[in-house]
Amino acid sequence: MLSWNNSWHSSSTENRTMEREIVASYEPKKNNEIRMFESSDEMATDLAEYISQVSEISIKERGYFAIALSGGPLISFMRKLCEAPYNKTLDWSKWYIFWADERAVAKNHVDSYYKSTKEDFLSKVPILNGHVYSINDNVTVEDAATDYEFVIRQLVKIRTVGVSESNDCPKFDLILLSIGSDGHVASLFPNHPALELKDDWVTYITDSPVPPPERITFTLPVINSASNIAVVATGEDKAKAVYFAISDGTEGPDAPSIPARMVQPTDGKLVWFLDKASASFLEAKTKNDGYEHPKY
């Protein structure tokens, strides 16, 4: 069910007022939610509040907040966290940063997700350098994937990163993803053999259809084991992929090949953050009732 509110609606979350012109709640599958926004600023504001609350709950329950990031425009949406009140109220000392995927380039390369994340986010908040787990750029892509999985396994042993109760996969508190126009998430592309991996936590590819060809990526079991997953989509070029990923009305061979459709938390919650353009293919039912912003 997709419900819309086309009028301004205010709701309070942790003493913070959130306002949006278009908001949606999508619940075709258990623990899935969809949110739509009129502007990028509204999306960034809501995403910051969402990340803040997941962080606070994770630190309260576990003593840590382990978040894995991806590339694309989503890092720019995290800039709100560098501003008041978050830059002062969040317990940055408990944050641990990982990457759900990375391009096999030097850290100072223009294509590096680490570089863009450092410039747009990490350099602006007091996260400890020792809590930032970037991917080794001094070895082959295969060795980098092996090394990264080893690092994560050590952190799971001491529970800096949680562990799934249903399998032995790491249970990140939040994995933040973007979606490509072809429906890829992280560096998991349509019809790629990496989608079939069950036992590996981190893998590598050398044939990405989007340059650069060599990449490191979390596997689907790791992504789906997270406590929280957020997928951010912007732009009309993502509309078809978003539709195939989340609409129950999709049929035929295209739907199963969309990696984003395979993102279904085992024991967690999935939230989609969409602008109007990326949500334009979705069938929506207009309602006049208000929408209460959920608490996490």
UniProtKB/Swiss-Prot annotation:
GO terms for molecular function: 6-phosphogluconolactonase activity. It catalyses: 6-phospho-D-glucono-1,5-lactone + H2O = 6-phospho-D-gluconate + H(+). One of its GO terms (biological process) is carbohydrate metabolic process. CDD domains: 6PGL. Keywords: Hydrolase. It is an enzyme of class 3 (hydrolase). Pathway: Carbohydrate degradation; pentose phosphate pathway; D-ribulose 5-phosphate from D-glucose 6-phosphate (oxidative stage): step 2/3. Pfam families: Glucosamine_iso. Hydrolysis of 6-phosphogluconolactone to 6-phosphogluconate. Belongs to the glucosamine/galactosamine-6-phosphate isomerase family. 6-phosphogluconolactonase subfamily. PANTHER family: 6-PHOSPHOGLUCONOLACTONASE, 6-PHOSPHOGLUCONOLACTONASE 1-RELATED. This is Probable 6-phosphogluconolactonase 1.
